[in-house]
Amino acid sequence: MAVFTTVSQDEIARWLLDYDLGEVRALRGIASGIENSNFFLTMEQDGVTREYVLTIFERLQFDQLPYYLHLMDHLARHGICVPAPMPARDGEILRELKGKPATIVTRLPGASQLAPQPDHCAEVGAMLARMHIAGQDYPRKQPNLRSLAWWQQTTPEITPFLDAAQRKLLTEEIAHQTAFFGSGDYAALQGGPCHCDLFRDNALFDTDSAGNHRLGGFFDFYFAGDDKWLFDLAVTVNDWCIDLATGTIDMERAQAMLRAYHAVRPLTAVEAAHWQDMLRAGALRFWVSRLWDFYLPREADMLQPHDPTHFERILRRRIDDAAALPWI
């Protein structure tokens, strides 16, 4: 179980005296998650039971968290299905628990859909577009901290662990992305707050009694940052719309996502021209981070890192797939 800081129900009940959420009825650790300790929290107030998620942050510090939490609050207030942070009586949404930053957010309905079909992808695409539009007037600013500058900084640290073919691929792709990021076309791409990590396990789908499903929402915004919207879409397609064994794009799923996104926020000609570049950028970002996690684990790492070859394979596919990429 990925609960690294333990806390008892009695401890939580005392901590929650500063909130107006009612009485604690249950506290259960959540097995998923790598970066934080997460718990399902059941509260009862005026005879009504409500579900929340308590997160204790294991790596991020107090000064690193306001962008993410206030973005979630902003999006929730604009009708986007994301966890809404709950304020304490003093209005603060971030407080200390066991010497670490902690927050309580609303629990989204549903479960992750790990074998998505085109209709799932369409719902994700439409909500991603709505999220991008809703975030346009978010006042806080923070760049995507895992973008080009981080790739450039990290590459010299990981190249000693790579074979000659991998070093060549990484060096050439960094050069390609450096040129792309410095171009006028890149500067012209629209952007704003992005999730930057919208994999299929960071969204939930709810199913009704008739078997119909609906998107319950997006969560885990702790890699979010200001970036190009096309990058966020590329990251999402590179996970939701591929064959996991080969990295090949499933055209039906990808076009369902792209068309649903486009129906909400029309994609532009310059975005079409650089779709391959962004799919490559999305693959590179996660290849670099997985290489870094795999070969240079931090002392506090507590779980097995992901296999980096998955995104190496996806990057090679995106470079070779120029004539067979999905679009609207």
Swiss-Prot record:
Pathway: Amino-acid biosynthesis; L-threonine biosynthesis; L-threonine from L-aspartate: step 4/5. Keywords: Amino-acid biosynthesis, ATP-binding, Kinase, Nucleotide-binding, Threonine biosynthesis, Transferase. Disulfide bonds: none annotated. InterPro entries: Aminoglycoside_PTrfase, Homoserine_kinase_II, Kinase-like_dom_sf, Pseudomonas-type_ThrB. One of its GO terms (biological process) is threonine biosynthetic process. It comes from the Bacteria. The keyword ATP-binding applies. It catalyses: L-homoserine + ATP = O-phospho-L-homoserine + ADP + H(+). One of its GO terms (molecular function) is ATP binding. Its EC number is 2.7.1.39. It is an enzyme of class 2 (transferase). Belongs to the pseudomonas-type ThrB family. PANTHER family: AMINOGLYCOSIDE PHOSPHOTRANSFERASE DOMAIN-CONTAINING PROTEIN (PTHR21064:SF6), AMINOGLYCOSIDE PHOSPHOTRANSFERASE DOMAIN-CONTAINING PROTEIN-RELATED (PTHR21064). This is Homoserine kinase.
